[in-house]
A protein has these predicted regions:
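Hydrophobic or amphipathic alpha-helical targeting/insertion segments
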Residues: 107-133, 145
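Active-site-adjacent beta->alpha loops and helix N-cap segments on the catalytic face
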Residues: 25-27, 51, 75-88, 108-111, ...
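Glycine-rich, proline-tolerant flexible connector loops at the mouths of alpha/beta enzymes
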Residues: 67-93, 97, 101-102, 127-139, ...
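Short, well-ordered coil/turn segments that N-cap beta-strands
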Residues: 28-31, 65-67, 93-99, 121-123, ...
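Helix-rich catalytic cores of soluble enzyme domains
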Residues: 133-180
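Acidic (Asp/Glu)-rich catalytic clusters
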Residues: 85-94, 112-123, 156-166
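N-terminal small/glycine-rich loop or linker at the start of catalytic domains
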Residues: 22-47, 126-140, 166-172
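Catalytic domains of carbohydrate-active enzymes, especially glycoside hydrolases
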Residues: 53-74
Length: 180
């Protein structure tokens, strides 16, 4: 039984947790759904969608009533960059729809992401970084405060680029593969 420690708690809860919603009978308002069907990323099909197919899918998602649509990872994919530029340059994004773009917390990727959304009226910039114990130890060779610093710096960069952006920017952050 020498390996029992590997099952130790590897997560933490926020200091002040409010879970009043658990006691409610029903939701007060409908949730906001964000479609992520257009991002190929590392979940790509063997033959990923081309710009024309993405346009067709985007128009279908609009028809279905989605108000938030993740259009991809434009800093990492030229197809997704070109697709987003096409939507903006051809005024295909309705005024009540937010396009969402995904990027890692790295300055060159955040800069390229903001380049991709120039001319967009409103966008959600979704940043992320790896936070799992295994990845921070084995891949990044960093301790927890350094990983937190990556997220903080990414947030500061989005804030910096958003200050010069003529449209509305919403920041979204996610830990990637959170396990500790």
């Amino acid at each position: 039984m020498k390996n029992y420690r590997k099952y130790a708690k590897q997560y933490f809860l926020p200091k002040e947790v409010c879970r009043d919603w658990v006691a409610r009978d029903a939701l007060d308002e409908a949730p906001v759904w964000c479609s992520v069907d257009l991002r190929d990323g590392n979940q790509a099909l063997v033959d990923p969608m081309v710009v024309e197919e993405k346009i067709e899918m985007f128009q279908y998602l609009i028809k279905l009533g989605f108000k938030e649509i993740e259009v991809g990872f434009p800093a990492a994919s030229q197809i997704e960059f070109d697709f987003l530029r096409h939507l903006i340059e051809h005024d295909m994004i309705p005024d009540d729809v937010y396009v969402q773009v995904l990027t890692q917390c790295r300055e060159e990727l955040i800069a390229r992401t903001f380049e991709s959304i120039q001319g967009c009226k409103q966008a959600i910039v979704h940043i992320y970084n790896s936070t799992s114990t295994l990845q921070r130890d084995v891949v990044f060779h960093m301790d927890r405060p350094h990983i937190v610093d990556i997220a903080v710096k990414g947030t500061e960069l989005v804030k910096k680029y958003a200050a010069d952006f003529p449209g509305k920017i919403v920041l979204e952050y996610s830990p990637e593969s959170f396990t500790g």
